[in-house]
Amino acid sequence: MSSATRSIVLTAIAILALLSLPNHSRSNAKPDDWRPLFNGKDLTGWKHVGPGEDTVEDGLIRTHGGMGLLYWTAEKFGNCRIKVVYKMRDHNDNSGVFIRIPIEPREPWMPVHYGYEVQIDNQPEDSKEDEYHVTGTLYSLTKPLARPGKPGPEWNTMVITLDGPHTVVVVNDVKVTDYTEGQPVPARKFDFEPQHGLRPNEGYIGLQNHSDNDIVFFKEVAVQPLH
């Protein structure tokens, strides 16, 4: 065997050996992997602001009182999917998932006005704004494409996709919201409705505790990169 041939053979063997090794970085960060933000035991990584509180009971996040906000402190999220699995204590209860919060909140109203609240409320109070307050809508800004939210103690799965300025909300495998920054939104009528304006592509996320009469349980909060 010539030295040139021997060199080629040894190089091929080395490449095959490398390919046979486990790719730890790939196996730990697959694009289709969901990364849990709630460990099922405590609220490590989360911080509460505003009235009320959130506790962990039987492996679930439970809302108490309000209106307050439990947000993930470690990082902002963009170009990802956010999965939230939740249920209501009663036939209908009010909560929400906040996205695109520009800075760490110090009180609960800043995320309402300068982020987006993805609503959890199957039967909003009777008003002209009802269409804009249904589960899966961007609160006060978008009408629902469908109303697939399940009542009472039934589990719901909400998946929020953040793709640059594009936001898509799917509830129980049914699309409810498909919104891109800059699309028309209804005029603001009440002080509690969000301020109009563009939101950042990346932001903090949080869970709302709405009031003493609105108890919601969260079983899973997870993120998945888009790219």
Located regions from the model:
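Bacterial N-terminal signal peptides
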Residues: L10-S20
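Carbohydrate-interacting regions of secretory-pathway proteins
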Residues: L21-H227
